[in-house]
């Protein structure tokens, strides 16, 4: 895998707002630019009277004066009155622009900067307080300070006021910074907390919508996801007890993704399936008639004459059982043999799969692995069709399997990549090779050459541009050695449930967290489990906020830490940005080189 190093430099004002002590301290630096170019201040010589009169010759030697310098006689009189240019005569050329002494006076500049600071601080200190009316002139002053001239103008995100973000774990070290960053950028923020008491209220701004709920209790999450557009999950177990890890890091993610999906499905139904997050239904197995059009085929990869003497044969069936389930089952005892279930897709008029990014299958069974095959080509000539395959694994019981189109590889290596626009046939194949027994005693007693696959539905996932769910996980570095495997097991289970949910996701695995200001050091983004250095909480929070609207962050998992000297043999890091300014988005070039759906 190829990682990337970027220089993370948050804006100076942002860093001061979100320092490691999470206080409300605010400071401002006003740079006073002194004017060293004397030619900008022009002091004209004294003009003669209107009636010309001959002047007596002077005995004094004329001294040449540099432009912009003031002779003793002229300076005392002119500066005492006004530092300005005399009105030009009709014959003289236009004079340069005037410059007041107060414009370059350091004391005056300091007073003006202090006034701007006091006005901004007064407005921000009133956030979350009782509302009051604002005079028009006062509102105009505030707009000029905050939008046109103020220090917060570069943090505003267009359309942020129309986006509601649910922050889970808002009182954690990362969550508190995430909430404040979202507020500064104009988002509507909801915070999910387990209990609402004075200590929790003091950790969050008053303008945050606080929702009481528990990720371990699905019934409490329905109201939390209402009206939410995106979710940032910063919660983590408070202990390394197995029950606590499972409840927060595994089931918590599963319960929240399910509640969010149910909410999106309700919206799609209200909008008659016209929601941008609506999936395309390819097949739903709810009756015996839904099995029409599916065809069972058998075949072998090669012929083995010796093994054919002991060939046990193969058989498969696809039926709607008495328990009202569509089950594809059978066995393959033939060496090199396979059985498959195939159907030609029938899409709604005007619909093509190029608008979607993959397939999601809701299936159950005995935990076998299968091969999903897509046939693509012109519908007028099926002989030109090409086959593309992707391997999937199932679990014992029901699960959702997500298969992105980018995971499909051509059967013939010389064929071009898959074009979803040309897909016309879907096939699911079982083959005995590469099968692994299911964990547990029941799995050890199963014959790996038999299979059972129960179908609920097959849908196409919409190709969204942005992520829906951001999960802050961990790399395992910094965790006690005797508890690391247990922690990582729960984290991986939560990540896996998010990937299978069908939501657009971003999984961030930071190194050991540090309490220090963000934006001070370069960051490393990697996908090779090689991260060992720490990272500040502010930097992780900044990545979460930037990933909300970054298309390169969708459906990606990555590790991140502060820059370090790579060990020999793992120097595969690419320098994609350095010394970025406030307007530079370091996340896009860093994530563009990483792989999706990992």
Curated annotation (Swiss-Prot):
PANTHER family: FLAVIN REDUCTASE-RELATED, NAD(P)-BINDING DOMAIN-CONTAINING PROTEIN. Disruption phenotype: Impaired photoautotrophy. Seedling lethal. High chlorophyll fluorescence phenotype and severely affected photosystem II (PSII) subunits accumulation associated with a drastically decreased synthesis of the reaction center protein D1 due to a reduced translation initiation (ribosomal loading) of the corresponding psbA mRNA. Plants lacking both HCF173 and HCF244 display stronger PSII defects. One of its GO terms (cellular component) is chloroplast. Gene3D superfamilies: NAD(P)-binding Rossmann-like Domain. Residues 87-97 have a biased composition (Pro residues). Residues 73-84 have a biased composition (Basic and acidic residues). This is Protein HIGH CHLOROPHYLL FLUORESCENCE PHENOTYPE 173, chloroplastic. The keyword Metal-binding does not apply. GO terms for molecular function: mRNA binding; RNA binding.
